[in-house]
Amino acid sequence: MNTMKKEEIIERLSFLGEDIRENIDKEPYLSMYIKAQQENAWFLKENIQYSLKQFLPWLEKKELHDFVAKYEENKKQKNLAIVCAGNIPAVGFHDILCGLLSNCSLQVKLSSNDKVIIPFLINRMSEKTELPVRFVDKING
């Protein structure tokens, strides 16, 4: 996968924040809530929306810039495997956010109880630029 510049990642993440803010009660989010609940009966629309709203402070450009300024930049893209739990809607999203901001190519193993929300969010961010995120059934490496 291509190495993305940090600014591109920040743009995509802040776009997602705006998208959530503007569309949380509209399509295609409404369809995603239905699919997620079909997969996990505990993932009610209200619970998913609550989780999404908790991400909003992380998805502000200023917050993202402040966050990355605290760390030395990885010049060379590294591979990172993330195994997501499934007890809270999109619980692995913060790990993905940190991996992207750290210039990592991600292998993400989703929980069997949450295979809808995170791919949906990555898809929303990837509309203009492909992100270095690959969903896998088994972590290799």
Task: Please state what every model-predicted region is.
Residues M1-N79:
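N-terminal Rossmann-like NAD(P)+-binding subdomain of aldehyde/semialdehyde dehydrogenases
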Residues Y33, L64, K70-G141:
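Rossmann-like NAD(P) dinucleotide-binding subdomain of oxidoreductase/dehydrogenase enzymes
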